[in-house]
From Swiss-Prot:
In the N-terminal section; belongs to the methyltransferase superfamily. tRNA (mnm(5)s(2)U34)-methyltransferase family. The keyword Acyltransferase does not apply. Residues 261-654 are annotated as: FAD-dependent cmnm(5)s(2)U34 oxidoreductase. GO terms for molecular function: flavin adenine dinucleotide binding; oxidoreductase activity, acting on the CH-NH group of donors; tRNA (5-methylaminomethyl-2-thiouridylate)(34)-methyltransferase activity. Keywords: Cytoplasm, FAD, Flavoprotein, Methyltransferase, Multifunctional enzyme, Oxidoreductase, S-adenosyl-L-methionine, Transferase, tRNA processing. The keyword Oxidoreductase applies. The gene is mnmC. Its EC number is 2.1.1.61, 1.5.-.-. Disulfide bonds: none annotated. This is tRNA 5-methylaminomethyl-2-thiouridine biosynthesis bifunctional protein MnmC.
Amino acid sequence: MSDFQHAQLDWDENGQPLSRAFGDVYFSRHSGLNETRHVFLATNRLAERFAALGDGEVLCIGETGFGTGLNFLCAWQLFEQVAPAGARLEFVSVEKFPLAAADLRRALALWPELAPWSEALLGQYLAVHPGFQRLAFAGGRIGLTLLLGDALECLPQLDARVDAWFLDGFAPAKNPDMWSPALFAELARLSAPQATLGTFTSAGFVRRGLIEAGFAMQRVPGYGQKREMLGGTYQGPPANAGKPWYARPAPHAGRRAALVVGGGLAGCASAASLAARGWQVTLIERHPGLAREASGNPQGVLYLKLSAHGTPLSRLVLSGFGHTRRLLERLRRGHDWDACGVLQLAFDAKEAQRQAQLAAAFPADLLHGLDREQAERLAGVALPAGGLFYPEAGWVHPPALCQALAATPGITLLSGRAVRLRREGDDWCAYAGDECLARAPLAILATAADIRDFPPAAELPLKRIRGQVTRLPATPQSRALRTVVCAEGYVAPPRGDEHTLGASFDFKSEDLAPTLAEHQGNLELLREISPDLLQRLGADDLPLERLEGRAAFRCTSPDYLPLVGPLAERAAFDEAYAVLARDARQVPERACPWLPGLYLNSGHGSRGLISAPLSGELLAAWICGEPLPLPRAVAEACHPNRFLLRDLVRGQRG
């Protein structure tokens, strides 16, 4: 990712952008709008296909070369004009050199007709960093997944079934890598049966390459002065489904209703993602209200713990950060959240070395190093060291995010009732005692480590880690703190009249009553972050017994990745794939014995603000047969079946 960069543009006398790297235009100098409508919308017959969609049906468009977003905006405009109200559009686009936000705004200003759609895109076009980035519009009716990086690196990571292709890279003579047999093979792998394709080029080697990949291609009249272009239909075989234990369950058909058990961030996000797709969701919380456990802290930190080595966890964090950061735009800045930035101090030599590797691996608008003087100037208080600054990050009031997600139309909240689930016919039923409170064909467990109270998930290796935060009254002097500062702990600028600092880690205690010892420990973490801030707060003079705070349990897994996705029935799984205990390289051709309609969203540890909301989108994609919003390898690394598979291969149970 160290070579990731925004597009370098020149602007012609008419204010139109040109790529400096490829020496080519982004769209026709005569009429980019009409060109898009002819080459991509008409060739793919999108007007009639959009109009024919049924309630809850989705059409997926794939694109090579997002560029200025013009094709996406034109498709969205047409969809709104002709598609039935209950239909949805998914758009997946790969782009190696995304435009900077200011350049995108300048380019889209050329098309006043598209202003409502352009403004919506620009409003979500933030925290757009390498990898998969998920954006949503029109209350979730329009989904955009940007794959930011080289097409031949990104597309093999994509799990999707594309109904229509826009091939819109720069001209083959200028950008030959975008028109290679390897890319055509990826288009074929990702294509739904009879997927259509349109492209402005009529180059013979492109036509022959697409035919070789399984597309029936023909030359058709081009736009404007271009005599010919290409259109086609995929007629090749369907792609191999891959390992059956990670294969998609059959997309849900029938009544679109779901139960979500758990009113924390994972549950609220899961409910919101389904409700945005037209589902009726019953959100069940055993406490009197939402966000009463780990999601109930007054301030959480939107902090990216990344790796320079592209691990699944690091890629999840990078994609999840962008998604959450865009969600936060719905909330009240300064009260519910603040993009004040996060400064991670280089508190020892090992941490300084790690930070140097990260600064070399990621773009500067995501993170960059500061020396001590720069860090102090930015933070507003004296610090023991410089560190790594994340300018788009900050603090969040998690209950506000939970409330906003749970307010999505289509969600009904049942609070104050602990339930157990029982399968009855084609439904999951939520029972409180002998009373069935709600029923639906699909259920999502989002109760952190307590998902193990439900028999199908009882053997999953989740553990609870107690954490305590301390609330300190702000003083006139402490209000100088302008950014979150982290070392082994963290301290945030004040929300209202209080700072939050923490958080402790206790692997043994099951007691949620705040302790004086952990308040003292949090003050020591603050002393390591900034003795100056400790003094400004007068913390040494505050009686410990008068300090306020709260404790909750984080839920984590052995590999620190969450559990997100469908779950198999364990005994049937062991029987179906017993051969793996003898030879883990085998891939038996046996369908996974899924527990019908049961999904999990749990195990987010201390990263829930970043990973839980995007995990709601991942669940919805699993359920609805949509493009996964994460690389397939990352989705598999988060799959609940990974632990069933691990135990089978190792000859272990439980």
